[in-house]
């Protein structure tokens, strides 16, 4: 729902589709990488400068914190570490990130929760089931 053309966003999406079409390895993680990179174009990237090992991730405020926030939109220290690693994933290295189906589904659920928190106009998506089927 952009009021004017967003050329960087369009270029990112076009490039992503091109990469997916030629990708030979790592396709199972493509959707995770795409969604995390898309955050920056939509204006709600996690603040990685606040990350430290053992910190919680406050999904509501997009920051890492040494103490658990009082709301429930939090990743514990282990999940926060995985999330921090994921933010370093790009289309060139995503084949090196190994997750089983359950881990990938849990990560997708967390990313979609993060999206809903920062884009309240996003209704419940039906696409997670499609993404799980395609990238499994």
Kindly label every feature range from the protein language model.
Residues 1-136:
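Non-catalytic alpha-helical scaffolds and adjoining flexible linkers that form interface surfaces
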């Amino acid at each position: 729902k952009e009021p004017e053309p967003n050329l960087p966003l369009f270029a990112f999406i076009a490039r992503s589709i091109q990469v997916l079409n030629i990708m030979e390895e790592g396709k199972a993680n493509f959707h995770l990488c795409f969604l995390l990179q898309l955050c920056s174009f939509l204006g709600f990237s996690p603040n990685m400068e606040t990350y430290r090992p053992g910190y919680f991730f406050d999904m509501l405020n997009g920051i890492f914190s040494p103490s658990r926030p009082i709301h429930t939109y939090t990743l514990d220290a282990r999940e926060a570490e995985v999330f921090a690693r994921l933010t370093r994933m790009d289309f060139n290295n995503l084949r090196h990130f190994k997750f089983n189906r359950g881990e990938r589904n849990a990560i997708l659920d967390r990313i979609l929760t993060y999206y809903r928190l920062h884009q309240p106009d996003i209704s419940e998506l039906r696409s997670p089931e499609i993404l799980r089927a395609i990238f499994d």
